[in-house]
Amino acid sequence: TDAELKLYADELAHKFIITDGHVDLPYRLRMKNFRLEREYLGIPVSTKEGDFDYERAKKGGLDAPFMSIYIPSSYQLQPDFGKSLADSLISMITGIADAHPDKFAIALSPAEVEANFKTGKISLPMGMENGAPIGNDLANLKYFFDKGIRYITLTHGKDNQICDSSYDTTATSNGLSAFGEQVVAEMNNLGIMVDISHVSDSTFYDVLKITKAPLIASHSSCRKFTPGFQRNMSDDMIKKLGENGGVIQINFGSAFLDSAVRAGNEENRKKLQALLDEQGLKATDSLAAPIIEQFQKENPSLFADVKIVADHIDHVVTLAGIDHVGFGSDFDGVGDSLPTGLKDVSQFPNLIYELLKRGYSEADIKKVCGANVLRVWNEVQAFAQSK
């Protein structure tokens, strides 16, 4: 029965390790001026805000959310390219783990994720979103590896010194820069996963030529469902990622999942903007608040739903096979745009239930939940150790 299948999904969510390629907790806490003091330290354990905390992660069976050390593109213009911001976000995550040693632990390898899972702790592996803080010095890769960074998203919303971004239109390097080629090779040598979410198509193909280890897309979805949205991966890219042994971790943001939802929300945004312009108001003006509230009541946001996330997973399986897909929610990073049924980390069982309904086996579910990502991480580590 349906009720039994739901219980079974919940059981599997807790039986298997669930990884999530991208959770933006660090930056969300930074925006709140989070400090490592007693009254703040409870936030990562239990909070009504945001999409992630310990209690909800336990409920949903999430075991290893990659904490995003996010460096906004504006930091590329700073003298240190955002290195001090990266340091402070890393310290925040290590501080949270130190403050709650019974609940959280930093994880530097798949073996540590597995050990933490056995003792009921949530692993906090770290990935850096935007390679800007490497600056122009390859030695910074070792510096960040030693601080615990295990993947680097080569760029974010703008082209940087390493490569071009899918959100930018300038094609500064027409893909990977000469320095970027060295960065990829050195990441392979150190055992840092190369993350191709956010990069332009030509960057992706350039990286494929150079990498000697499997790649990840930490939080990207399938372009088939969002034609023209360069931030998602095309069918050809997904196939090639599979041939490389890599894994695409599906982003749960509605705009990444469904072009109709994306277009509807964009339409609403334009309507609201026109309404405010008419009154000569900015969205941040106090007089705008009631207008915005009324507009949102009459034109509620559209959301994708959990079935569409499963459609994206199905599509990757069709193109590349069951070994090349995982979860990369972007929780705490996509704002109020999460699908119905996947509003926070407590709801992973809803997605597992949807996959079970489609005939995914227990072995399949285990792979999608986390085994695929841990395999890639192990392979990346093994390549580095063979040097």
Regions found by a protein language model. Give the residues of each.
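N-terminal hydrophobic targeting/anchoring segments and the immediately downstream early-domain regions
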Residues: T1-N174, R223, P227-K387
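Distinct, well-ordered alpha-helical segments
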Residues: D137-L141, T203-A213
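Catalytic glutamate of the conserved HExxH
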Residues: S220
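Substrate-binding cleft of carbohydrate-active enzyme catalytic domains
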Residues: Q182-I196, S200-D206, D235-E243, H315
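Alpha-helix-loop-beta-strand connector modules within alpha/beta enzyme cores
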Residues: T172-N188, V207-A217, L351
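A short helix->loop->beta-strand "cap" motif at the edges of active sites that frequently abuts
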Residues: I122, I192, A213
